[in-house]
Amino acid sequence: MPTRAELRDHLVRTRIAGDVATSRENNLDHYRSLANRDPYHLFGLTLSDGWSYRDVLALMAKSAGVVADPEHRSGQDTIDPDRTIDAIEAMGERIGQVLAGGRARLMFATGHPTGLLAIHLPLARLAVQHGATLLTPAEGWSYVGHGFGRRRRIRYFGGVAMLDDRGGFVHTHDADPMRAMIAELDGVRPDLVVADHGWAGAAGEAGLPTVGFADSNDPALFVGEAEGKIAVTVPLDDNVLPRYYDPLTAYLVSRVTRAL
């Protein structure tokens, strides 16, 4: 397990945090889209009034560490690695507390299988090792989602829900798959949902205890956290090489076990 200082250096070196690959232009475009209540950027959340573009930018500067100056409109943007680590510690404590209660029920889901699956899978295994049940509702449920015109379905790997498109796991912001999972829970409420993108947003909107990961250009979960619908949101680049997440995952696992 890395120390906090070692993890901080690693996050900056691999651009999980620090000077990230997501451009300032892309970040600001997504903040405007969220302020305009674009469904694609809401991740299944409904927001209270008052979240203007400037409000979203100010929140992202506070929660993720992007540049606060609204006049900085192009070029490099940032994620504060210390905010990332603080959120990892908070997430680890929350997961550990749930597992410590015994016989916990958890759901895992990711809309970024090429990146964040590398974090979800070890967490799911850890949960099982500590007596948790991984809920896997709506496996095989399918729908024609937004913008791609063909049917996709929920498939689980290692207890983690993802979208399958003709044999491949795919990126998605959609909230509909998590809504389908919740509809099939049949009264069995998970003690915690660990997710990202629309999977996390829909869970939080439904009132399920939820922790999640989000990139600097995905402000919805941070707004959801500010409104009390998401318990913890970890800011990070969500699509670096999967092996780059290993030290972060080891640090997170250590925080979970410390809280048990």
Language-model features and meaning:
Residues 1-105, 110, 114-122, 255:
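Electropositive, gly/pro-rich neighborhoods at or near active sites that engage anionic ligands
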Residues 91-95, 178-182, 248:
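Generic hydrophobic alpha-helical segments
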Residues 100, 128, 204:
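Anion (oxyanion) recognition and catalysis
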Residues 109-120, 196-201, 217-219:
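Gly/Ser/Thr-rich loops at beta-strand to alpha-helix junctions
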Residues 119-177:
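Long, charge-dense
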Residues 129-142, 206-223:
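Short, acidic/small-residue loops that bind anionic groups at enzyme active sites
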Residues 180-208, 212-214:
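Glycine-rich phosphate-binding loop
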Residues 188, 211-260:
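C-terminal functional extensions of proteins
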